[in-house]
């Protein structure tokens, strides 16, 4: 039956609906023939995993499950809750505790966040750029009146601590958008909330209020007059068609369900900006000829929502990932202001850091750095890409690359929440250029990874790279053309 299901799915569904983007997962690759006893022992498990992923129709089955769970009033996914009014709430335990006040900043966490803000501010000031930090409140904060009493705030939240204590320690300008958006929620009407009922972001009216508040804050810091942006009663508010404007429909495989219709919110004559460029990891909004303030938003998913109204105040707004702040980015965008924009729940984890150039360490420098975690070097935990072949040997994991520079091997390392040193001990049979790539922040794949190239000589080589990302996602990709080496050790070291 399982064999027939795969064939039947291939015949019944159009190719577009079987594409990896529709299935929301990378296409599975069939495991190659093992070359060692450990590989043969792991083969049944790898075949079972590949076979289960090869069966199509996951989005239909998972979508049916979502509809059933919502109908029963049960959580459709982990940390996602539905209430009787049909609203969806994303409330991970760490974010809930930080917002409720039961998990406040301790001295160490406060120091980490203050240090990150201070580093960002100093980097910007060195380039003649003013720096600010903007906290976008969680939907659960702004619409707290719609939540159950047992989820109410008890003590000062991390957001409130951040606004006062962390900002003072870092000597940085911080804007908390919660008071303005809580006030805006008092103007809600049926079908016109400040945050999407079925998503996590602001509606167009919520974006307007956040943009006005941010523009007014920047003008006040500059000592400039209050910006003239559209008032609430001046907004152009045509109804938007029922769509997945900002819903969990995609993540829950429920396209066609979870539709929401809200009024738009735009200036009376329409927006004056144009989207000058949009590429992976960066968007550029330009008003008129681009003259006026330049603002760089190192922002999470709230950034583009905020940029639409900031671009009515500034001449140019560039939106980049929160972890992408670097000297190079400041030099290429040449902003007057750099704003870190993060959602409130991020305060429960790690601060956005400054992306510094990768530093190669000498082997003698590693003695003082304690080991934090090691990779398991066997074919069951590593993954070959392209024509690369991997095999377990007595001294480590053998990797033989093909002729493509994209051939490589993915080593599974535990995630890291702080900057770390990646250490690779290699025995090189065939030398060449090795590209080491890693993921930082929330990137789901290797499309926007960072990388660093090193030249491998024949014989023993130790590669030690200090990586500045605050959130290292673990997996490391080693790629190159025609390389042949043995990985004897792959580990994270603590940065002192």
Identify the residue ranges that each predicted region occupies.
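Solvent-exposed beta-strand/loop surfaces of large extracellular or lumenal domains
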Residues: 450-454
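Residues within well-ordered beta-strands of beta-sheet-rich folds
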Residues: 421-427, 464-466, 477-479, 491
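Extracellular glycan-modifying ectodomains
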Residues: 1-398, 407, 417-419, 424, ...
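Exposed aromatic-hydrophobic patches
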Residues: 410-412, 461-468
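Acidic, Ser/Thr/Pro
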Residues: 429-431
């Amino acid at each position: 039956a399982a064999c027939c299901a795969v064939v039947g799915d291939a015949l019944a569904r159009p190719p577009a609906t079987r594409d990896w983007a529709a299935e929301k997962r990378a296409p599975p690759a069939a495991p190659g023939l093992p070359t060692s006893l450990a590989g043969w022992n792991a083969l049944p498990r790898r075949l079972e995993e590949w076979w289960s992923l090869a069966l199509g129709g996951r989005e239909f089955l998972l979508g049916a499950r979502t509809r059933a769970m919502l109908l029963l009033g049960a959580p459709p996914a982990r940390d996602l809750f539905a209430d009787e009014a049909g609203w969806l709430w994303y409330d991970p335990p760490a974010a809930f505790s930080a917002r409720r006040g039961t998990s406040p900043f301790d001295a160490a966490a406060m120091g980490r966040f203050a240090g990150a803000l201070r580093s960002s501010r100093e980097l910007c000031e060195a380039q003649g750029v003013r720096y600010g930090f903007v906290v976008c409140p969680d939907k659960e904060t702004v619409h707290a009146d719609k939540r159950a009493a047992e989820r109410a705030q008890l003590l000062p939240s991390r957001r409130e601590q951040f606004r006062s204590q962390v900002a003072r320690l870092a000597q940085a300008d911080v804007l908390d958008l919660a008071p303005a958006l809580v006030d805006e929620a008092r103007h809600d009407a049926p079908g016109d909330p400040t945050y999407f009922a079925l998503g996590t972001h602001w509606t167009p009216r919520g974006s307007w209020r956040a943009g006005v508040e941010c523009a007014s804050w920047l003008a006040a810091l500059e000592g400039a007059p209050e910006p003239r942006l559209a008032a609430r009663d001046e907004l152009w508010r045509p109804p938007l068609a029922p769509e997945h404007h900002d819903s969990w429909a995609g993540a829950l495989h429920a396209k066609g369900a979870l539709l929401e219709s809200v009024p738009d919110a735009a200036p009376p004559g329409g927006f004056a900006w144009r989207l000058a460029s949009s590429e992976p990891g960066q968007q550029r909004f330009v008003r008129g000829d681009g003259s006026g303030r330049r603002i760089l938003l190192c922002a999470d998913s709230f950034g583009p929502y905020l940029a639409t109204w900031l671009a009515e105040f500034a001449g140019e707004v560039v939106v980049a990932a929160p972890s992408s702040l670097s000297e190079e980015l400041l030099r290429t965008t040449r902003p007057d202001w750099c704003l870190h924009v993060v959602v409130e729940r991020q305060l429960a984890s790690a601060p956005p850091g400054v992306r510094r150039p990768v530093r190669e360490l000498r082997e003698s420098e590693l003695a003082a750095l304690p080991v934090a975690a090691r990779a398991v070097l066997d074919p069951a935990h590593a993954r070959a890409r392209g024509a690369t072949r991997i095999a377990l040997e007595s001294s480590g994991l053998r990797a033989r690359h093909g002729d493509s520079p994209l051939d490589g091997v993915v080593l599974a390392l535990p995630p890291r929440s702080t900057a770390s040193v990646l250490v690779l001990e290699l025995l090189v049979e065939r030398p060449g250029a090795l590209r080491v790539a890693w993921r930082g922040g929330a990137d789901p794949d290797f499309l926007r990874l960072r990388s660093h190239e090193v030249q491998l000589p024949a014989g023993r080589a130790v590669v030690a790279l200090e990586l500045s990302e605050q959130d290292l996602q673990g997996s490391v990709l080693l790629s190159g053309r025609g390389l042949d080496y043995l990985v004897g050790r792959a580990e994270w070291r603590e940065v002192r």
